[in-house]
Structures are given as structure tokens and as C-alpha cells.
């Protein structure tokens, strides 16, 4: 009996570990736009409200699980819809590499779509979990993902669903937190088309109406360059200046503004799939770095 119980326990743990590993394979390429920055904002809320260390640890752990499910729902739906494209462009993704079957991914998506809002309800952020699910359905099953405006709105409104939930896991959203959320929402909505520079040929082949295909690659690059060039002004005025003229705020202002200017130059001067992929990764890291800065600018 003891041996059977031990074997059962081992089987359960192996299954759990395998599911955690598979979920990581699905979400790892999106961690810089979801899991890492959102967890930073949870921690910023904890610092702002002066939570004791033990409560802070619980809030952060709760946030990590919430945003793991948050991005897992997106990546499961996204990779199921884009399977044929991924066979050509992204051979390491789980559905293409055989780490997960299509049927397994569909079952996982059903499970996540049930578990995610329930967990959101438990944490007191149900409205934001449901907003994210509505956006996901519109993006992957409602056609938003095939048009530049829908794609940008999905990313932009998704910032609201992400960051409002992150803060409310700890406390009600403050006016200062809303200032950050609104600023980043507008920024992401306007500039998210940088992701569509990476595979213009593939998007054209599948009939996707991305911004570079609708307005032209050159015009899109000029627009994005202008947006990133104006970035330092928005960063300073809306995110950094309200925190006061401390040296660490000035240093952060310079770093974030400098990275924004670097992106402005890259988007027009560094072209090609590999360069555009690198540019997009820098955008993701800029977003995470900005939200890491909220730890001491919103305290």
C-alpha cells in the first residue's frame, strides 16, 4: 500500500512538473511583456502601500501565478491559431516541435479559460480577468488579429487589463497608478505595430492587414520613429517628473529616454527580419524596465 501511494504521488508530481514545463515552453517568448513587468507592478503596489514583508511575498507569489495564467491563455490561443505559420517561422514552439499536441493545447486552453477568471475572482480582480478574456476572444476568434487596428487595440487595452489587475491584487488603483497605466496604454497602442515589421512577407502571404502592409513599410517606420523619438518627453512628463528631482529619478529618466531614442534610430536604420526582431525585443525590455522603475517612483 505504501509503495502504491508513493508511486501515485510520484506520478502526480511528474504530471504537474510536466505541465509547468509545457506551459513555460508556451509562454517564454512573451515573458518580457507580461509576467516580468506585471509582477514588477504588483511589487510596486506593495511598496506603495507599505505591506509587511510576509504579505508582500504572498502578493507577489499570487501575482506570478495570475500573470502566468494571463499569458498562458494568450499563447495557447495564439499558437493554435497560428500553427501553420509557426511551422515555417517558429519551429521551436511546442505545437510545432511536438512538445504538445493540438488536442492537448485545446484542452489546456479550456482549463485555463475556466481557472483564470476563478483565480481572478479569488484575488478580487475578476473584472480585469474577464476583460482580458474578451480581448483574447476578439483577437484570436473575432478577427482582431488580422487587422492592424485590432492588433494594436488588443495590446493597448491589454495593458489596462494587465496593470490594473496587478495593482488591485494589492490595493485599489490610485490616481498615480492610473497615470502610469494610461501613459503606457497609449504608448503601446500607438507603437505596437513595431512587432509587425518582423514578418511582412509572411503577413502578406496569409492576408493579414498589418500596418506596414496597409500604410507601407516606409511610412510605418517613419511613424514609429517619430513615436519613439517623442518617447523621452512622455516618459519625463508623465512617469518621472511627478516623482521629484531625485538623482535616481533623473538617472532612470535618462536611461529610459535614451533607450527610446535608440529604438527611434533602430526602426529606420536597422532593417531586416533579424534586426527588426532585435528591435522588438528591446521594446519588450524597455516596457519591463519602465515598470521596474515604478518600484521607486510610485512608492
Swiss-Prot record:
Cofactor: Mg(2+)
EC nos: 4.2.3.216, 4.2.3.217
GO molecular function: lyase activity; transferase activity, transferring alkyl or aryl (other than methyl) groups
Alphabetical list of InterPro entries matching this protein: Prenyltransferase_related (IPR050475), UbiA_prenyltransferase (IPR000537), UbiA_sf (IPR044878)
Uppermost EC category: lyase
GO cellular component, one term: plasma membrane
Catalytic reaction equation(s): (2E,6E,10E,14E)-geranylfarnesyl diphosphate = somaliensene A + diphosphate; (2E,6E,10E,14E)-geranylfarnesyl diphosphate = (-)-somaliensene B + diphosphate
UniProt keyword annotation of Ribonucleoprotein present: no
Keyword Secreted among UniProt keywords: no
Keyword line: Cell membrane, Lyase, Magnesium, Membrane, Transmembrane, Transmembrane helix
Pathway(s): Secondary metabolite biosynthesis; terpenoid biosynthesis
Subcellular location: Cell membrane
Record-annotated membrane-spanning stretches: 32-49, 56-72, 110-132, 153-171, 177-194, 222-241, 247-269
Membrane topology: Multi-pass membrane protein
Free-text function comment from the UniProt entry: Sesterterpene cyclase, which converts geranylfarnesyl diphosphate (GFPP) into the terpenes somaliensene A and somaliensene B.
Record family assignment: Belongs to the UbiA prenyltransferase family.
Protein name, entry field: Somaliensene A/B synthase
Organism of derivation: Streptomyces somaliensis (strain ATCC 33201 / DSM 40738 / JCM 12659 / KCTC 9044 / NCTC 11332 / NRRL B-12077 / IP 733)
